[in-house]
Amino acid sequence: MYPGFISLPLTDRCSNIHKILFFIMLFVIGSTVFWSCAPTRAVTEPSAERLFRSKDYVVYQLQDNETSAELAERFLGGKSQSWIIEEANPGIIFKRGAAIVIPLKDRNRAGLNPEGFQTIPVLTYHRFAENCDSPLCMPAATFELQMQYLKKNGYHAITAEQLLAFLEYRQRVPEKSVLITMDDGYRSVYEIAYPILKKYGFTATLFIYTSFVGASGMAITWEQLKEMKKSGFTIGSHSIYHSDLTRLKVGETEQQYLARIKEEIYGSKKIIDQKLGQNTYIFAYPFGYYDQRSIQIVREAGYKIAMSVKRGGNAFFANPLALRRDQILKKDMPTFISRLKTFNPLSLK
């Protein structure tokens, strides 16, 4: 493949690929007709299901009404990779006879192109109810409309592990990626949000402060967290007591303050690890407050990702221990949609 072709954005490369498919198909048909006129010669016909293959991509002719998920399972190792095929074939209808481009290599992991770069918005919720009386509470019907919008408009609710791989330049993520997070550990996350998320095929990351878990009828339980984890949800730390990590309490000495924030950060990880049998790698700063000292302790405790509530998205070059999140407090759809910015336009030519 020519270097100039490889340097093009994926959509341009795939457009060029589709332009040559006609000629490839003519070659396949012509070869078959030619050899059919020479019956005395033993011939191995080209595969009827694969028009072209290189180390970079496959051009595949659909034999039936195969889906992108079925092709992803066959060529890319799992149905969850179907978005790669969908993004490589914009506007193509998956039906018998269609030629589909299947990228085999993970290119452009940073989400860069000449017009700008990819950003990943992180959406933050707290509790849910049928009727709400607080900005931190999201009505169930409104939350369902929001998830319905994400699904209908091609957004992918990625996992925290996918976000980490993107930030570490290990893995590409879908162009329209969002991470859904829920803070504190309210039971309504399990009773209301969880069924809605499953309905649309989404997962989320829960940040719990461990002293709250199971402490009242409003709190989620460890058994419920175990169930959600088995369903693909990620459980992260939000400290033990949800105290401000950036300032001393009244009457607290510097030594006492340092011991307290270390316990909040280290201790919560230890509790979650023991309760859920995992290595907790993601943390949300209580109230979204952080400073250089808390970042350093979070790093030393073994966390790979830590999140604030500073508004905005996260590019591949973002500090993984100071990521931005948008709290979804208003209930109207225009405001929600405005938080879904997945691309930052900036001329990189």
Language-model-detected regions and their locations in the chain:
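N-terminal secretory signal peptides that target proteins for export/translocation
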Residues: 1-17
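Bacterial N-terminal signal peptides
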Residues: 23-33
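Extracellular LysM carbohydrate-binding repeats and other cell-envelope/extracellular binding modules
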Residues: 40-55, 70, 77-115
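Extracytoplasmic Gram-positive cell-surface binding/anchoring modules and repeats
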Residues: 65-71
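Acidic (Asp/Glu)-rich catalytic clusters
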Residues: 116, 194-201, 220-237
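A short, conserved beta-to-alpha structural element at the edge of catalytic cores
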Residues: 202-222
